[in-house]
């Protein structure tokens, strides 16, 4: 509750600041500099500029921004072309860097005549990596909405299946997933026959509707965890400290219709991992901005929206302001009263 109150407060403050710019400044205010979508990009930025992928399952969502000058930025993650100078170490698929083998590589993103690079190190690729229960399975259940209060996270559960609210009791969830319903809930011998997968995929009637898409991050995490025997992590496994949501607050003008989000998880052993694919997103105003399951914000209208990212029990926010040019607008030049 306190976190959501803080988000609402920041949302109100940002609106006041924007209104102040409208009232107190002239048409030269930089927030309202006109964007010409045809203007060639002046510079390109890729985030994170340097990162490490640990293990054969590691990935990193990239964020590429075009800065056309005049305070005009837009997301170009899905528009640029990518190249890895060492495909035996890392490859790029749909804007995601995926580990292929140990070593280092440079990723180059290009848009027209400009480019930006990121340095990647891949470690422990040959080391088997089990799906962690606490940081991936619980996150997958939360992202899919299975453990929300209106679903199986309610005190009495749904359809005889009960999970802790948003994964706040991992031990209860582990017992439930391993042993309930005569092991039909999760079938380690035939993972694809598990009700935990078939129901949210709508292969079997499910009152909660479709919650998973075959092949998405949540589905793969749950399936692989079941196939591996539904293990939990050993003692001393690094825990999550905090998350960071990118980009930082920004203003998007005409021509900027979407914004890729990236969520970085900071763990107790000092490692930083991409957790975007298993993060749940929300928006303060769906008439201004909507969010896809892949973490892409799409413009719905004009105004400001606060974007909330929730991974396990950690949250982070950013603000996106969508501006639209109004050619018919004329400053009324009110008379001075002081």
Region locations from a protein language model:
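A composition/secondary-structure signal for short, hydrophobic, low-basic-content segments
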Residues: 2, 30-33
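Alpha-helical and His/Cys-centered functional microenvironments
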Residues: 10, 22-23, 64
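N-terminal secretory signal peptides that target proteins for export/translocation
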Residues: 1-13
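Aromatic- and Gly/Pro-enriched helix-to-coil junctions and flexible linker segments
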Residues: 32-338
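Bacterial N-terminal signal peptides
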Residues: 16-30
């Amino acid at each position: 509750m306190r976190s959501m109150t803080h988000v609402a407060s920041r949302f109100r403050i940002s609106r006041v600041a924007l209104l102040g710019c409208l009232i107190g400044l002239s048409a030269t205010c930089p927030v309202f500099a006109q964007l010409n979508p045809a203007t060639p990009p002046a510079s390109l930025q890729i985030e994170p500029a340097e990162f490490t992928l640990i293990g054969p399952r590691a990935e990193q969502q990239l964020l590429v921004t075009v800065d056309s000058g005049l305070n005009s930025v837009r997301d170009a993650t899905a528009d640029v072309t990518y190249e890895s100078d060492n495909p035996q170490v890392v490859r790029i698929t749909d804007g995601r860097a995926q580990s292929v083998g140990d070593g280092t590589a440079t990723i180059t993103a290009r848009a027209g005549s400009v480019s930006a690079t990121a340095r990647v190190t891949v470690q422990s690729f040959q080391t088997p990596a089990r799906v962690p229960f606490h940081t991936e399975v619980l996150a997958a259940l939360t992202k899919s909405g299975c453990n929300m209060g209106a679903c199986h996270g309610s005190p009495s559960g749904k359809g005889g299946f009960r999970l802790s609210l948003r994964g706040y009791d991992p031990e209860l969830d582990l017992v439930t997933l391993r042993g309930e319903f005569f092991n039909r809930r999760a079938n380690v011998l035939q993972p694809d026959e598990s009700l935990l997968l078939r129901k949210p995929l709508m292969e079997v009637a499910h009152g909660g509707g479709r919650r998973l898409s075959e092949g998405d991050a949540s589905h793969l995490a749950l399936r692989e965890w079941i196939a591996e025997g539904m293990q939990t992590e050993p003692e001393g496994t690094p825990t999550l400290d905090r998350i960071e949501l990118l980009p930082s607050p920004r203003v998007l003008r005409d021509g900027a219709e979407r914004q890729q989000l990236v969520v970085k998880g900071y763990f107790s052993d000092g490692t930083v991992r991409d957790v975007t694919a298993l993060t749940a997103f929300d928006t303060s105003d769906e008439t201004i901005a909507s969010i896809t399951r892949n973490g892409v914000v799409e413009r719905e209208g004009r105004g400001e929206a606060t974007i909330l990212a929730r991974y396990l029990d950690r949250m982070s926010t950013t603000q996106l302001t969508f501006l639209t040019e109004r050619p018919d607008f004329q400053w009324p030049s009110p008379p001075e009263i002081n």
